[in-house]
Design a protein with these regions (language model features):
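Patatin-like phospholipase
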Residues: 2, 44-51, 55, 62-71, ...
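C-terminal catalytic-base region of ester-bond hydrolases, centering on the histidine
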Residues: 271-433
Length: 433
């Protein structure tokens, strides 16, 4: 069976980033969002329109001189930040500040607030639709936007994948006019798909980035490490998940829906009449996966990097490219495939996993689904960035370190956020050439 062709990415060594603590400050150019508030008086998401700022070296952090000149007319690139389970926009406080400082004035940075806290339990599909509506609201309220990117942590990556399938349109905007674009959807065509076909919320899709996202669901010690491979815990996890984390739990364990129907995460690896999951991903110029190779007890290395067990190698420890805790970067080319399937034996395995959730039944079912999901997702290319917090003060906080959930507790991930920002900046530079 086809396996993704991955090659290492070569780094240019950057001067070390000054990992001083940064706090986001409201921009004088920000346009406040009106009419929204979270439950119990929670703080709503806000616009952070990044403007050119002086660095500690006295330079101006912008994508290019061309982008800097554009910023005088206002930012045109919308960057959506999506938090994970039982979280809120405040998870991105540090990330917003760093992105604002490093990216310059051509970006509107917006932290999503439509799925805060227990709303993340309502289901990936429900949360994805909420996020899609929120993004449309933002786009409609902002003038001059031309491009869109997403950065999502953990479960938020699945919300974002669902949302872009709704926001995807087979139209290209050209100087106020639009022309239909009709790419073919078959496996081989998608694998050779040229980024740039189609738009997201009417904007040109640029970057789709996830950090520690369970793209293949959660099951067993390699997908949900805190179970420690103990059969009793694995046996209890799936049936209890819906009671603890609602519909979202069943979807993550691939046990949602009728036995005869494929689970949502499998559906999300192919195109359908009303939701173009793979075409939406393929429309982005760059797709990047950040994955913890160890110490992440919520989301395992395999599921967050969309790899098979045999593709996992011994974790590396030496940082690359001058970014602390980034230990490996590689690009996996798209692989031709006829797409994912849900054969009758998978339906029988799902029924067994639902009715008698012992380790043997669930493992057989999940292995089948895992392979099918990989078949679907590898039809687009991915840049994969492996992260290892083995040398940090709190390595077991890897799941929250990777996006610096709290700048005082999880600041070991500062190098990861810097790498994310510079990856986006590199895209800007390439586009301006």
């Amino acid at each position: 069976m086809a396996s993704a062709l991955c090659s290492p990415c070569h780094h240019h060594h950057h001067r070390p980033f000054n990992y001083r603590r940064l706090r986001a400050s409201p921009s004088s150019h920000a346009r406040p969002r009106s009419g929204t508030s979270g439950p119990s008086g929670s703080t709503t998401a806000k616009y952070l329109c990044s403007r050119p700022m002086s660095t500690s070296r006295g330079g101006s952090v912008t994508c290019s001189s061309t982008e800097a000149s554009k910023s005088k007319q206002g930012p045109d690139h919308l960057l959506i930040l999506v938090h994970g389970i039982m979280a809120s926009p405040s998870d991105w406080t540090y990330g917003e500040a760093v992105l604002k400082k490093r990216l310059g004035g051509n970006f509107v940075i917006y932290a999503s607030s439509s799925n805060i806290y227990v709303k993340t339990f309502d289901g990936i599909d429900v949360a994805g639709r909420r996020l899609a509506k929120e993004v449309l609201d933002v786009v409609q309220k902002m003038d001059g936007l031309r491009k869109i990117s997403f950065i999502a942590h953990s479960l938020g990556g699945l919300f974002a994948r669902y949302a872009i399938s709704i926001l995807y349109s087979l139209k290209e905007k050209e100087m106020g006019s639009s022309s239909s674009v009709m790419p073919t959807i078959g496996g081989s065509e998608i694998s050779g798909h040229t980024p740039g076909l189609g738009v997201i919320a009417g904007l040109e899709p640029i970057n789709f980035i996830t950090l520690a996202t369970p793209h293949l669901g959660v099951r067993g010690k390699n997908q949900l490490p805190f179970l420690q491979g103990l059969s009793i815990l694995e046996k209890l996890a799936a049936p209890l998940a819906p009671f603890i984390v609602g519909r979202t739990g069943a979807q993550l364990f691939l046990t949602d829906g009728e036995p005869s129907k494929p689970p949502l995460l499998l559906l999300m690896t192919s195109d359908h009449d009303d939701t173009m999951f793979i075409s939406a991903l393929a429309a982005f110029k760059n797709r990047i996966l950040y994955a913890n190779v160890s110490y992440d007890h919520m989301v395992g290395w395999k599921t967050s990097s969309i790899r098979r067990e045999l593709d996992l190698r011994k974790p590396l420890h030496r940082s690359v490219g001058g970014y602390k805790h980034i230990v490996n970067v590689e690009y996996c080319s798209p692989v031709s495939s006829d797409g994912p399937h849900f054969p009758s034996r998978a339906a029988r395995a799902k029924e067994a996993a639902q009715s008698t959730p012992n380790t043997e039944n669930t493992e057989e079912y999940h292995k089948m689904m895992e392979e099918e999901m990989i078949h679907g997702l590898q039809r687009v290319g991915w840049k994969k960035v492996d992260v290892n917090f083995h040398a940090s003060l709190w390595p077991y906080s890897a799941h929250n370190n990777i996006h610096v959930k709290n700048e005082w507790v999880h600041n070991a991930g500062a190098g990861v956020i810097a790498h994310v920002a510079d990856s986006i900046k590199q895209t800007c530079l390439q586009a301006s050439l």
